[in-house]
């Protein structure tokens, strides 16, 4: 996944293209929506 950044969060997240939700199984704990993609934290 491409790197992405959410304001107020340390480090970087994974950018998932054209997704409205973060996929399970990666240990993501938070996310921010960047239409039409989503940024899932932590990387």
UniProtKB/Swiss-Prot annotation:
Subcellular location: Secreted; Nematocyst
GO terms classed as biological process: regulation of blood pressure
Pfam families linked to this entry: Defensin_4
SUPFAM superfamilies: Defensin-like
Keywords for this protein: Disulfide bond, Hypotensive agent, Ion channel impairing toxin, Nematocyst, Neurotoxin, Potassium channel impairing toxin, Secreted, Toxin, Voltage-gated potassium channel impairing toxin, Voltage-gated sodium channel impairing toxin
One GO CC term, this protein: nematocyst
Listed InterPro entries: BDS_K_chnl_tox, Myo_ane_neurotoxin_sf
Disulphides: 4-39, 6-32, 22-40
One annotated GO molecular function: ion channel inhibitor activity
Chief location category: secreted
Domain of life: Eukaryota
Similarity field: Belongs to the sea anemone type 3 (BDS) potassium channel toxin family.
Note: Negative results: does not affect on Nav1.1/SCN1A and Nav1.6/SCN8A sodium channels. It has little or no functional effect on cardiac muscle, as well as on skeletal muscle myotubes, suggesting lack of functional interaction with Nav1.4/SCN4A or Nav1.5/SCN5A. This protein sequence is identical to BDS-1 from A.viridis (AC P0DMX6).
Function (record text): Acts as a gating modifier on both Kv and Nav ion channels, and also acts on blood pressure. Voltage-dependently inhibits voltage-gated potassium channels Kv3 (Kv3.1/KCNC1, Kv3.2/KCNC2 and Kv3.4/KCNC4) and slows inactivation of the voltage-gated sodium channel Nav1.7/SCN9A. Inhibits all Kv3.1, Kv3.2 and Kv3.4 by about 50% when tested at a voltage of +40 mV (45%, 48% and 56%, respectively). May act by binding residues in voltage-sensing domains S3b and S4 of Kv3.
Protein name: Delta/kappa-actitoxin-Avd4a
Provenance organism: Anemonia sulcata
């Amino acid at each position: 996944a491409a790197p992405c950044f959410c304001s107020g969060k340390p480090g970087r997240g994974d950018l998932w293209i054209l997704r409205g939700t973060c996929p399970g199984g990666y240990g993501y704990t938070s996310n921010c929506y960047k239409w039409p993609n989503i940024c899932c934290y932590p990387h």
